[in-house]
Design a protein with these regions (language model features):
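Intrinsically disordered, low-complexity segments enriched in proline/serine/threonine
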Residues: 6, 281, 286, 291-293
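Sec-dependent N-terminal signal peptides
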Residues: 7-14, 298-299
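A short, hydrophobic C-terminal helix/tail in secreted or cell-surface proteins
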Residues: 289-308
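Short, charged juxtamembrane terminal tails flanking transmembrane helices
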Residues: 312-317
Length: 317
């Protein structure tokens, strides 16, 4: 039988990763790569659409499909099974959050590895993205490839999740995600944000997007007008956006941290993907935990060490 103290210490270690499971989490870092992204909005009420991919000029190494929308289900697999390019796929749930005031119980977001189904540029059909009590807003495709030219490669850090900007019981208030340990020397850097539920409620509906506390854009940032529409959605927006922001000016030679924030104003939004595009060699191999995460880890390790010593003392006493 295991020691209660030992079990508590191990549990504390596991709680480190689960404290804010619905905020964006680091999914993967792809180093020394070429990449592109595409998406489609206007899928609400249809459940189908097409993503037209361009910019691929070499062999595909990884490809990921993301989608999200409101649901009346507590089943994490409620909208996991869909069709991509006519092939059935099953996504991983990457977070529950607020329904963004649509009268549903929640929203759910998903990710699927579609590397084997993406051969290069072209049109990829989407179908079966709605079910009874389950809707979808849009979808994104993120593709990594090798064009044979190492001089134009990047490091890309992918965050994913389902982070609503309005107060809700699923995740922390607003958007607030960080990437630490960026070893920057030179070159351009950018952040691409894939956002669910963008609509136009006026010129100041989205508030202010901040990088490291500095405002970079205010007003109508995510209006549901940055991507092709499948033909559904609502009158004032296609409910899905991808926007890219240059963040080079926020990096200095040496170690850096990038933090991005958006508050809640008039437009309820869900952040699904954040892709941090860095010069090759700049990305940390693994994300470096924030200080509070270190504190929890150290506390758990200390408890584990104490429990182990106590067991040894009882065994020899």
């Amino acid at each position: 039988m295991s020691s209660p103290r030992l079990a508590a210490a191990v549990a504390a270690l596991f709680l480190v990763g689960g404290a804010s499971a619905n905020d964006l989490q680091n999914f993967t870092t792809v180093q020394d790569t070429d990449w592109t992204q595409a998406g489609v909005g206007g899928m609400r009420g249809l459940g189908s659409g097409t993503i037209t991919l361009s910019g691929v000029s070499g062999s595909v190494t990884q490809a990921y499909l993301f989608w999200a929308g409101p649901t009346n289900s507590t089943d994490p697999n409620a909208n996991a099974g869909v069709l991509f390019g006519g092939t059935s796929i099953f996504g991983t749930n990457i977070g529950f959050s607020q329904d963004n005031f649509w009268g549903f119980a929640n929203s759910q977001a998903y990710r699927a590895d579609v590397t084997s189904l993406v051969s290069g540029n072209g049109s990829y059909s989407l179908a079966n993205f709605t079910k009874p009590g389950v809707e979808v807003n849009g979808a994104s495709l993120v593709v990594f490839f090798d064009d044979g030219n190492d001089t134009n490669n990047h490091d890309v850090v992918l965050f994913n999740g389902n982070d609503a900007n309005f107060p809700n019981p699923f995740d922390a208030l607003g958007w607030n995600s960080s990437l630490s340990g960026i070893n920057y020397a030179s070159g351009t850097a950018a952040i691409s944000l894939h956002v669910s539920d963008g609509q136009n409620f006026g010129g100041d509906d989205d508030g202010t997007l901040r990088i490291n506390g500095t405002p970079i854009l205010s007003g109508g940032i995510f209006q549901g007008n940055t991507l092709p529409s499948a033909g559904g959605g609502v009158d004032n927006g296609n409910l899905w956006d991808i926007r890219t922001f240059d963040v080079t000016s926020f990096l200095n030679p040496g170690l850096n941290t990038l933090n991005f924030q958006l508050d809640a104003i008039n437009d309820a939004l869900g952040l699904i993907v954040a892709a941090v595009d860095l010069p090759a060699g700049a990305a940390p191999v693994t994300p470096i935990p924030e200080p509070e995460t270190y504190a929890l880890m150290l506390a758990g390790l200390a408890a584990l060490r104490l429990a182990t010593r106590s067991r040894k003392a009882r065994a020899t006493g």
